[in-house]
Amino acid sequence: MADTRAVAAATSLVLTLGVVCCAAPGLAQQPDSAVQRRDTSVSAEVLKQLSIEQLMNLEVTSVSKRAERLSQTASAIQVITREDIRRSGASSLPEALRLAGNLQVAQVDSRQWAISARGFNSTTANKLLVLIDGRTVYTPLFSGVFWEVQEVPLVDIDRIEVISGPGATLWGANAVNGVINVITKNAKDTQGFLLSGGGGTELRGFGTARYGGALGSSVRYRIYGRGFARDETDSSSGQGATDDWHFWQGGFRVDWDQSTTSRFALQGDLYDGRIAQPNADDVAVSGGNVMAKWSRTISETSHLTAHLYYDRTHRDIPDTSGEHLDIFDDTYDVELQHQARLGARHDVVWGLGYRLINDHVGNTPALAFLPAHVARQWFTGFVQDEIALVRERLHVSLGTKVEHNDYTGVEIQPSGRVNWTVSPSTTLWAAVSRAVRTPSRIDREFFAPGQPPHLLAGGPNFHSEEELAYELGYRHQHGDLALSVATFYSRYHGLRSLERVNPPAPFPLVIGNGQDGESFGAELTAEYWVTQRWRLSAGYTELRNHIWPNPGSTDASRGSAESHTPDRQFFLHSSVDLPARVRLDARFRAIDDIANQQVPGYAELNARLTWQPTSKLDLSVVGQSLLHRRHAEFGTPPTRREIERGVYGVVEWRF
């Protein structure tokens, strides 16, 4: 891991900040008047109790596609709340995801991120399913996420539910090692004007404008626009990497409470951006989406929901010769879901879905997707029954997802989960799950160069990667301390490989399923209220990935493309409420080295200082990567980028 002395020093700094702020004579206990002292004490106590309760009793929906208490979930789930995001100083969704200790998050350059759960990390990671309000943000090119265009306004996020481990039984293929579900606020919670903006050394300039209003007594809406400019990162030699970029996005949401039992929501976004690259024209990215959701409570024991969305993405990527790789993706998705309680012991959720993706690529001589245009369909159905063997004590969930895709046909992904409430403060859970990662276009239809003879070609017989996962977890609350432990072991079959066609000749290579593997480890998190004003949260992850070739495989990659993950990581977050409406937050992380990329381990510290002169105005200063002038987080030399220390200021006004 990062140098032990650096870790110890930074950890001591975070703790010392809290001790000084809370224990200095008169600092935390001397409000301006007796009235202020009484109001502040009550407010802090309420906040403390709510936070501890929320950790165990917060309602989540990502584990079983229905509302349930966090303490009752048989899954390794962490929740990033709106307050966590606000106090973190994060300026983008990937930065906010660093708050989840069960994720591996690495910044690659000014706009690219490598994000995964339980290993297999890369900028094209393909074993993590990401949703925004139920809309899958997914590219058929590599079964992953273009993180740089997932620019959800952070002030509009209600919470982010992060599951590490399989979620395929309910969410389908590619929810192999985790699910990230971003849930935004109802329009009724974003009424009035909000203006936010600022700038600094790396995040050069940014701004958000939002307005929420009402149409009658039952319809609420909001509209927003935002944009930013980011500075370039450094190359390993210290020179500018020419990867600065500019981005804007606008959108809306309408929530209509049709009656006490029926609700309808309509929302959408449009975006456009330009990304610099050395020795070539800028990369252009654009897209948009629109989504309709409807829900109806049929009775106290029956609830129906449906959604329909359309999503378009476009990327124009020039190369140094002036050729353009032009990519258009159009996604149409519809899903119907029904939840019903059957008798006193069964809570059943079932659903049907359909997805159509039209993908068109304008190829170049350097690389091509053949055929250039494809239309792929997915048909899905799922069912899960939660059985109360002993009410309020012992619950078992059994379910499966059945999915048909145009590449591999029918895929079945079952799971079984057990949740045992040992006492009101202690829970044990266990799970066994099967998940698959279905082929993407890069697995079957990618060719480099674009014309024969090819050095690298997609495998026409590439089949789904398979996982069988075993999990065991523990949760406990004692007073002001909450603990969570999740352990896991997974076996993988048919992992992606690069097969030599004519060994020992290094080329050509064909993408195949020539590798198997395993991963195992543990994820630990803790939250502790030291005082009414000072909260600490900490986490530690131990992870091992082992990958090996199958008998007869001529794989040339040796698993290197599947294992860019540190063995261990540690984080410590401190949040302190000071007098005079001042808040101080410090977030420390220590990340182990990535051996096969020669990325050294590192320790870093982010901090945010906020003053609220009035209830409607926030003034903040944020420091990022404060321990080093620059450092690397991901990538191989000599093309690796280094992330620089940054400072920026923020003004937020609500009226």
Give, region by region, the residue ranges found by the protein language model.
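Short, acidic, small-residue-rich periplasmic hinge/interaction motif at the N-terminus
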Residues: 30-86, 297
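Extracytoplasmic beta-strand/coil segments of soluble accessory domains associated
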Residues: 61-78, 94-136
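Short acidic/polar hinge/loop motifs at secondary-structure boundaries
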Residues: 136-164
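Periplasmic-side early beta-strands and strand-to-turn transitions of outer-membrane beta-barrels
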Residues: 168-169, 181, 189-190, 196-198, ...
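Conserved C-terminal beta-signal and adjacent last beta-strands/turns
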Residues: 212-214, 257, 430, 468, ...
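Face-selective signature of the C-terminal outer-membrane beta-barrel domain
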Residues: 257-271, 284-410, 419-423, 476, ...
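Outer-membrane beta-barrel signature, preferentially recognizing the C-terminal barrel domain
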Residues: 280-289, 293-297, 327, 427, ...
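Gram-negative outer-membrane beta-barrel transporters
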Residues: 388-390, 394-395, 488-491, 512-593
